[in-house]
C-alpha cells in the first residue's frame, strides 16, 4: 500500500507540473492540457500493460504502484468531467461534445498504440 501511495504522490506531482506547464504554453478555451495528459497516461498504461504485465517485464511488486498509483493519479477522469461541464455551463456545447468525443477516441487509440509498442519492444 505504501508503494501505491508513493506512486500516487509522484503521479499527482507530475500531473500538476505538466498541467501547469501546458496551460501556460497552450492557453485555450478547450481543455487541451487535460486531454494531452490523459492521452499520455493512456499511452503509458497501454505500454505498461503490454510490456510490463502481459510480457512479464514488470515485477509483481511494482505493478500496483506504477498502474494504480502513478498512472492512476497522473490521469484524471474528474478533471475531464469538470472541464466538460464548465464548457456546457458556458454554452460551449460544441467544444464540450468535442472534448468527450476526442478524449474517448484518442484515449482508446493511445492505449492500443501503447500495447503495440510494448509488443515490439525488444529488451
UniProtKB/Swiss-Prot annotation:
Annotated residues for binding of Na(+): 72, 75
Major place of residence: membrane
Domain of life where this protein originates: Bacteria
Annotated membrane topology: Multi-pass membrane protein
Protein keywords: Cell membrane, Ion channel, Ion transport, Membrane, Metal-binding, Sodium, Transmembrane, Transmembrane helix, Transport
InterPro entries to which the protein is assigned, alphabetical: FluC
Record-level GO BP terms: cellular detoxification of fluoride
Location(s), subcellular: Cell membrane
GO cellular component: plasma membrane
Residues annotated as transmembrane: 30-50, 68-88, 93-113
Entry's Gene Ontology molecular function annotations: fluoride channel activity; metal ion binding
UniProt protein name: Fluoride-specific ion channel FluC 2
Lineage per the UniProt record: Bacteria, Bacillati, Bacillota, Clostridia, Eubacteriales
Gene: fluC2
Amino acid at each position: 500500500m505504501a508503494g501505491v501511495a508513493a506512486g500516487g504522490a509522484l503521479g499527482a506531482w507530475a500531473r500538476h507540473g505538466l498541467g501547469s506547464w501546458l496551460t501556460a504554453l497552450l492557453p485555450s478555451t478547450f481543455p487541451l492540457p487535460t486531454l494531452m495528459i490523459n492521452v499520455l497516461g493512456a499511452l503509458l498504461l497501454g505500454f505498461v500493460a503490454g510490456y510490463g504485465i502481459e510480457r512479464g517485464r514488470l515485477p509483481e511488486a511494482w505493478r500496483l504502484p506504477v498502474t494504480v498509483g502513478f498512472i492512476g493519479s497522473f490521469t484524471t477522469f474528474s478533471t475531464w468531467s469538470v472541464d466538460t461541464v464548465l464548457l456546457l455551463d458556458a454554452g460551449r456545447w460544441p467544444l464540450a461534445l468535442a472534448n468527450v468525443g476526442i478524449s474517448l477516441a484518442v484515449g482508446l487509440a493511445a492505449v492500443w498504440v501503447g500495447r503495440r509498442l510494448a509488443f515490439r519492444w525488444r529488451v
